[in-house]
Amino acid sequence: MLAKRIVPCLDVKDGCVVKGVQFRNHEIVGDIVPLAARYAAEGADELVFYDITASAHDRVVDKSWVSRVAEQIDIPFCVAGGIKTITQARELLAFGADKISVNSPALSDPSLISRLQDEFGRQCIVIGIDSFYDAASDSYKVKQFTGDEAATKETAWYTQDWVEEVQKRGCGEIVLNVMNQDGVRGGYDIKQLSLVRQLCDVPLIASGGAGTMAHFRDVFIDAKVDAALAASVFHKAIINIGELKQYLAAEGIAIRR
């Protein structure tokens, strides 16, 4: 069994790390580089950075902090935010990112996924999917431009269909951001993640809902995801990554030490 990964997520806005609840009301939680260094020292397997307003504001990730992060940490990291061209992706990789992630730009132009895969290889192309459970229709729907509440819109894609589409296009990994669970620390959406797991032939990263160490255990065992992403529990020091890994190992989960 491949070891499971623990992935802190750092949402970046105006040069600072922020965190909201259900993608709203973001508050500043710290500076980018010190937080990245802290999580690397605690034992994170990799980091994900989302420039959350880049796509909505039609710009790309600020490369200056990407290079500073690369100088300070020795674990892989992925960056996302407004990446719409091969050139933009190449620049971010040259500045030190190990993977690039696309979300809203891929919804606007699905062929972007194939072009990135052809240029850089499947292994460094991550697709983020912002999935919202709509109770009225009892369905999972994909939203776009979620980093800016005023710009957020519902797409025509159902989550399951988009998961299948991005794999056909050549993505190497999927991060499923469950919007209803985001920031509330009530546990991962096991039902939705299990559904997506059945459709997913590439590594699947769970995002949204972590509040306790048991939540990580449950998502690995019950949803069979490859990695668990979390933000607020790490930013607020509710959970220490090293202690989390010890707990998971004691629970019989293969974990990178």
UniProtKB/Swiss-Prot annotation:
Gene Ontology biological process terms in this record: L-histidine biosynthetic process
Active site: D11, D130
Protein name according to UniProt: Imidazole glycerol phosphate synthase subunit HisF
The protein's Enzyme Commission number: 4.3.2.10
Pfam families named among the record's database cross-references: His_biosynth (PF00977)
Localisation per UniProt entry: Cytoplasm
Subunit field text: Heterodimer of HisH and HisF.
Catalytic function, reaction form: 5-[(5-phospho-1-deoxy-D-ribulos-1-ylimino)methylamino]-1-(5-phospho-beta-D-ribosyl)imidazole-4-carboxamide + L-glutamine = D-erythro-1-(imidazol-4-yl)glycerol 3-phosphate + 5-amino-1-(5-phospho-beta-D-ribosyl)imidazole-4-carboxamide + L-glutamate + H(+)
This protein's GO CC annotations: cytoplasm
Domain of life: Bacteria
SUPFAM superfamilies, per database record: Ribulose-phoshate binding barrel
Molecular function as annotated in GO: imidazoleglycerol-phosphate synthase activity; lyase activity
Gene source species: Shewanella oneidensis (strain ATCC 700550 / JCM 31522 / CIP 106686 / LMG 19005 / NCIMB 14063 / MR-1)
Gene3D superfamilies to which the protein is assigned, alphabetical: Aldolase class I
Pathway the protein takes part in: Amino-acid biosynthesis; L-histidine biosynthesis; L-histidine from 5-phospho-alpha-D-ribose 1-diphosphate: step 5/9
Role this protein plays: IGPS catalyzes the conversion of PRFAR and glutamine to IGP, AICAR and glutamate. The HisF subunit catalyzes the cyclization activity that produces IGP and AICAR from PRFAR using the ammonia provided by the HisH subunit.
Keyword Amino-acid biosynthesis: yes
Family of this protein: Belongs to the HisA/HisF family.
Main location class: cytoplasm
UniProt keyword list: Amino-acid biosynthesis, Cytoplasm, Histidine biosynthesis, Lyase
